[in-house]
C-alpha cells in the first residue's frame, strides 16, 4: 500500500473528533461503572464529538469553510470558538448532573485546549490532530491509570502521517502535542 494512503488512513482514524468517544467511555465507566457511567459517556459523545461534527459539516456544506479538516488555518477560528461553545454547554450539563471530577476535568481540558488552539491558529497552524490525541492520553494517564502512558506511542504514527501528508511541519506536530499535554495536565491537576 502506498505510504500516502497509509498516512491518510491514520489521519482519519485519529481524527480529533473521534478520540473523545473512547475517552468518555473509558473515563465515565471508570468513575461510575454503572448505567450512570454509560449516560455520562453518552453526554460526552454528544457534546464533544457529535455536535462538533454536525457543526463542521454544516459549515462545509454552506461553504463557510473549504474542507471539514480545517486545513486552512485562517478558517479555523470561528469553527473552533463555536465548538468551544458546544463544549461549555456540555460542561454545564455535566455540572448540573453533578458529574464526578474526572468527567468535569476532561471536558474542561477540551474547552481550554480548543480555545487556546483557536487563538494560536490565527497566527500559526498548530497540529490539532496531535493535540486531539495527546491531551486525552494525558487525561487517561492522570485520571484513570498510569499504564495509559503507553498510548503516547500513538503520537508517533500520527505525527508521521500528518508530516507525510504535508499537513504540518515537524515543529507544528511537536507543539500540537506539547501544548495539549501541558494544558491538559494543568487543567486536571
What are these regions (language model features)?
Residues 1-8:
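Short, Lys/Arg-rich, polar N-terminal cytosolic tail immediately upstream
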Residues 10-30:
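The first (N-terminal) embedded transmembrane alpha-helix
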Residues 19-23, 81-92, 112, 131-134, ...:
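Core segments of transmembrane alpha-helices
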Residues 27-39:
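Short, hydrophobic transmembrane alpha-helix segments
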Residues 100-189:
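Membrane-embedded catalytic cores of phosphoryl/pyrophosphoryl-handling enzymes
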Amino acid at each position: 500500500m502506498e505510504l500516502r494512503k497509509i498516512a491518510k488512513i491514520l489521519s482519519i482514524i485519529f481524527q480529533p473528533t473521534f478520540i473523545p468517544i473512547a475517552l468518555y467511555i473509558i473515563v465515565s465507566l471508570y468513575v461510575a461503572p454503572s448505567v450512570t457511567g454509560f449516560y455520562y459517556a453518552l453526554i460526552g459523545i454528544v457534546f464533544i464529538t457529535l455536535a462538533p461534527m454536525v457543526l463542521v459539516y454544516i459549515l462545509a456544506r454552506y461553504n463557510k469553510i473549504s474542507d471539514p479538516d480545517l486545513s486552512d488555518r485562517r478558517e479555523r477560528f470561528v469553527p473552533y470558538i463555536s465548538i468551544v461553545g458546544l463544549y461549555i454547554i456540555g460542561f454545564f450539563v455535566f455540572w448540573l448532573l453533578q458529574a464526578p471530577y474526572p468527567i468535569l476535568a476532561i471536558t474542561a481540558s477540551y474547552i481550554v485546549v480548543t480555545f487556546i488552539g483557536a487563538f494560536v491558529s490565527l497566527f500559526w497552524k498548530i497540529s490539532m490532530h496531535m493535540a486531539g490525541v495527546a491531551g486525552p492520553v494525558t487525561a487517561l494517564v492522570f485520571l484513570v491509570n498510569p499504564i495509559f502512558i503507553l498510548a503516547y506511542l500513538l503520537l508517533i504514527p500520527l505525527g508521521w502521517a500528518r508530516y507525510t501528508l504535508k499537513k504540518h511541519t515537524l515543529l507544528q506536530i511537536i507543539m500540537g502535542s506539547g501544548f495539549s499535554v501541558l494544558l491538559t495536565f494543568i487543567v486536571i491537576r
